């Protein structure tokens, strides 16, 4: 999402005008969305004809690189919570239109149940809710990528435990530099430990005022500053990814035209 209160086609027009050729399907839900029908939100429906969505991107010369399916994996399953069912729909959509990656994460628990889980209970809950999506992804040739965006996945130790416990070829990692740093992690160390699992990157830098929140806040949707101007070691992370042999797509999760374009230039200056 680039601008609030703007439909998906208008968002794509904007990034096309900036010269971008790749993008994610980010905000989505199953069923219908009033905001999308009446023209003030960029939500895509997981129940839509997936080829209509692909055509919307392709008509602007843009290739879909992933479908985001960020979920609530720690609270109890319920019809109103984005979880296993929606991830499965995202996997089916991706497979239908030739998109390799579906990106998900556990999110912040909102209920007393989710907030009271021990680390081991949380790891088990995530495993249980991703079991069927991973089976389907494996059968359909799609990979589910876990993103640091919660108190479990922001820990490289816990992320490694999850990856090992699934033992699935359909599971990989989407590195989010801003989320990981904000949750208390070190993106450079993360790449050194799990670089061979990383298949997509969300780039975000964070301003100094977030230092006091580090380790207590898990995930932020969009950065508001250009890459290379904040406190995250973007250059070191880029170099670590190069050493790890990373050759996948990356996404600028950054708000504002000036910040987006400066970030693109910064990555190019590093050799992207």
Description of each model-found segment:
Residues 24-52, 106-117:
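Glycine-rich, proline-tolerant flexible connector loops at the mouths of alpha/beta enzymes
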Residues 69-71, 146-148, 177, 252-254:
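Short glycine-centered, acidic/aromatic-flanked micro-motifs in structured strand/loop junctions
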């Amino acid at each position: 999402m680039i601008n609030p209160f703007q439909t998906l086609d208008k968002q794509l027009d904007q990034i096309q005008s900036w010269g971008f050729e790749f993008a994610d399907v980010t905000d989505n839900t199953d069923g219908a969305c009033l905001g999308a029908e009446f023209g003030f939100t960029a939500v895509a429906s997981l129940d839509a004809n997936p080829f209509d969505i692909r055509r919307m991107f392709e008509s602007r010369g843009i290739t879909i690189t992933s479908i985001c399916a960020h979920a609530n994996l720690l609270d109890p399953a319920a019809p109103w919570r984005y979880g296993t069912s929606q991830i499965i729909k995202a996997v089916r959509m991706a497979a239908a239109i030739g998109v390799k990656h579906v990106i998900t994460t556990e999110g912040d628990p909102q209920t007393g149940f989710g907030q009271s889980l021990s680390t081991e209970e949380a790891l088990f809950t995530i495993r249980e809710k991703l079991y069927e999506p991973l089976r389907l992804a494996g059968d359909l040739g799609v990979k589910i990528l876990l993103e640091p965006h919660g108190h479990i996945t922001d820990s490289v130790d816990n992320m490694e435990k999850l990856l090992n416990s699934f033992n699935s070829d359909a599971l990989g990692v989407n590195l989010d530099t801003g989320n990981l740093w904000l949750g208390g992690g070190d993106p450079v160390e993360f790449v050194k430990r799990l670089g061979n699992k990383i298949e997509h990157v969300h780039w975000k830098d964070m301003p100094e005022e977030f230092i006091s929140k580090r380790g207590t806040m898990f995930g932020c949707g969009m950065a508001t500053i250009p890459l290379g101007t904040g406190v995250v070691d973007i250059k070191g992370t880029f170099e670590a990814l190069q050493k790890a042999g990373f050759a996948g797509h990356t996404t600028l999760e950054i708000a504002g035209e000036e910040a987006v374009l400066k970030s693109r230039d910064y990555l190019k200056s590093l050799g992207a």
